[in-house]
């Protein structure tokens, strides 16, 4: 009997000793959380998208609590509500959040452009891009394998006819999709913007015509038509200065290849 009881008691004693030791260590080596940081963290949506410029929600909350930044409006997904709650905690005036929405600067669907070869590898834009810059003829095109859609925390992106599309009603402007795109053709703009250029091709017009009938050919009709000088052709591609754009839509109406589109991000109208 003692042969069994002694080992059991020994192990029990070791377990109790370790438990006491861990409890003491937890008390003496505990890292006290900043109550202000905790309160701020609860105001944030928890997307951990990094759109604020910090590592995530915890990083932003800590920076605000430690007063290394006083900008209460950096959380785009949280919007004005989060900014107001943070400002109340810090005892400062709330700043307005510039809400943003993502869009894909490509309309090279399967109907208007071709593929260079049949890609049979892993269905990922990043992987496909490593093979001759992707399987689409246009090297600036959306590859359509959905890395952005997989990464989107709001399920706001879907693939339609070989091109990623953003549902502005779901998009929170976190910017995760922007960082996932290997071709860098997803952009964030203010959700009050009304006109976008759905092309990223910087080739000369003659070459663009051959590979995509929806591609910008740099004809400059939009630039000549814009009453505010908000759109210019830079490196063979129409580019909009949203600080000058009033959303009149004149550029879209004269675009011969229809790569400039009007949309309503606030109401969620799709392009």
Q: Where is each model-derived feature located?
A:
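Cys/His-clustered metal-coordination modules, chiefly Zn-binding fingers
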Residues: 203-204, 233, 237
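Ferredoxin-type iron-sulfur electron-transfer modules and their immediate structural context
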Residues: 2-225, 229, 254, 258-261, ...
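Active-site substrate-recognition segment that forms the wall
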Residues: 240
């Amino acid at each position: 009997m003692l042969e069994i009881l002694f080992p059991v008691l020994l192990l029990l004693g070791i377990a109790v000793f370790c438990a006491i030791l861990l409890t003491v260590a937890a008390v003496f080596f505990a890292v006290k959380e900043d109550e202000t940081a905790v309160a701020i963290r609860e105001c944030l949506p928890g997307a951990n998208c990094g759109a604020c410029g910090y590592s995530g929600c915890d990083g932003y909350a800590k920076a605000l609590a430690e007063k290394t930044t006083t900008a209460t409006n950096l959380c785009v997904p949280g919007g004005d509500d989060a900014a107001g709650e943070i400002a109340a905690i810090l005892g400062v005036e709330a700043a307005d959040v510039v809400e943003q929405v993502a869009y894909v600067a490509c309309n090279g669907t399967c109907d208007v452009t071709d593929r260079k070869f049949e890609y049979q590898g892993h269905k990922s834009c990043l992987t496909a891009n490593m093979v001759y810059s992707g399987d689409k003829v246009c090297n600036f095109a959306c590859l359509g394998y959905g890395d952005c859609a997989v990464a989107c925390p709001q399920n706001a992106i879907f693939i339609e006819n070989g091109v990623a599309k953003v549902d502005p009603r779901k998009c929170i402007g976190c910017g995760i999709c922007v960082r996932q795109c290997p071709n860098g053709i997803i952009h964030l703009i203010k959700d009050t913007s009304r006109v976008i250029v759905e092309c990223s091709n910087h080739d000369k017009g003659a070459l663009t015509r051959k590979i995509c009938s929806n591609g910008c050919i740099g004809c400059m009709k939009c630039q000549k038509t814009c009453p505010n000088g908000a759109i210019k052709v830079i490196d063979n591609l129409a580019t909009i200065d949203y600080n000058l754009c009033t959303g009149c839509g004149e550029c879209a109406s004269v675009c011969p290849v229809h790569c400039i589109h009007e949309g309503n991000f606030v109401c969620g109208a799709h392009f």
